[in-house]
């Protein structure tokens, strides 16, 4: 396992369990790939992905989420701070998915996209009262 994960000692922001698709791109690779955000906070994500990516790699990420009957998104740049191999099994113990879990720390996020992140992870009521600008129309 590269890096380490100790939730009590290293986590600076509370986590919210979510299940959202993302598109990501390694900053040095033109190929778009998909993954799933498992949990999120104001400071980063836990994602599950098939591709083996090195700790320290920066990713350009687009998070897709539903708002009413439409799919909207927000973008972040994040760095992989830890990774571990990960697999899932069905109720009979048969493995049906194998990939990696990655701990990501946000490096860049715009004010508008941070507002969208806050909306997604639970600050919906407060965020709707105080949007960053009147021009925001998802």
Write out the residue ranges for each language-model feature.
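Short, conserved beta-turn/loop elements at beta-strand boundaries and strand-helix junctions
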Residues: 27, 42, 82-89, 111
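Short coil-to-beta-strand transition motifs
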Residues: 15-17, 31-32, 69-79
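C-terminal output/interaction extensions
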Residues: 88-138
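Short, surface-exposed secondary-structure edge patches
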Residues: 48-54
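Short coil/turn motifs at beta-sheet boundaries
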Residues: 13-15, 40, 54-56, 71-73, ...
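Short conserved beta-strand and strand-loop elements enriched in small hydrophobics
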Residues: 21-26, 57-74
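N-terminal helix initiation/capping motif
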Residues: 1-40, 48, 118-138
């Amino acid at each position: 396992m590269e890096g380490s994960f100790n939730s009590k000692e290293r986590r600076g922001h509370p986590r919210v369990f979510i299940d959202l698709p993302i598109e990501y791109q390694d900053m040095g690779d033109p190929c778009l790939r998909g993954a799933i955000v498992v949990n999120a906070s104001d400071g980063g994500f836990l994602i599950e992905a098939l591709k083996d990516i090195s700790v320290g790699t920066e990713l350009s990420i687009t998070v897709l989420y539903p708002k009413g009957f439409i799919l909207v998104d927000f973008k972040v740049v994040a760095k992989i701070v830890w990774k571990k191999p990960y697999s899932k099994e069905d109720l009979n113990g048969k493995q049906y998915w194998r990939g990696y879990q990655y701990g990501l720390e946000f490096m860049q996020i715009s004010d508008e996209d941070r507002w969208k992140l806050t909306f997604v992870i639970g600050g919906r009521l407060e965020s709707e009262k105080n949007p960053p600008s009147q021009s925001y129309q998802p």
